[in-house]
Amino acid sequence: MRTASITRNTSETAIAVELNLDGTGAYSVATGIGFLDHMLEQLSRHSLIDLTVKIDGDLHIDQHHTTEDSGIAIGEALAKALGDKKGITRYGHAYAPMDETLTRVALDISGRPWTVWKVDLKGPRLGEWDTELIEHWFQSFAQAAGITLHVENLYGTNQHHIVESCYKGLARALRTAVEIDPRKADSIPSTKGML
């Protein structure tokens, strides 16, 4: 099975993540930030990646460390579960509509982390979550996972819808990219022979 467990303890956060790439989208998420929980639940449900996340963070200071470290730990778990990446589809993309909003996400499980973020969030918060941290979550996740990630909100007005479409787009793109291609189940999807 393609699974991973990550424990990450710093002076700022204590995190435990469990991940199953071949799951059904089952989740148990408790970060201490309600809107982040909601987004990680969407990520799990729509990627079909089972995800358990438990964080005890320094929220009495602010939400930065919890947000950043959750992205890092989930990214590390994804990379660990992928192992040598034999047989994966590697690339994934999705258009995620939500009411008046449409977002495009494309990714490559390349081993070359990069994030392009073209999302304009106008307000300072969603629920209690600082919106400036949302881009940082995606960057932290992509860096730790070793993926090239492009997220572009094409249009939309409701911030909740915009952010949720970003996470759902990521989920659907991951669902495709981590799938095993039975025609190449024993080979690395690269002419270099490694990712």
UniProtKB/Swiss-Prot annotation:
Catalytic activity: D-erythro-1-(imidazol-4-yl)glycerol 3-phosphate = 3-(imidazol-4-yl)-2-oxopropyl phosphate + H2O
Domain of life of the native organism: Bacteria
Locations listed in the record: Cytoplasm
PROSITE patterns, A to Z: IGP_DEHYDRATASE_1 (PS00954), IGP_DEHYDRATASE_2 (PS00955)
Enzyme class: lyase
NCBIfam families: PRK00951.1-5 (NF002109), PRK00951.2-1 (NF002111), PRK00951.2-4 (NF002114)
Family: Belongs to the imidazoleglycerol-phosphate dehydratase family.
Name of this protein: Imidazoleglycerol-phosphate dehydratase
Lineage per the UniProt record: Bacteria, Pseudomonadati, Pseudomonadota, Alphaproteobacteria, Sphingomonadales
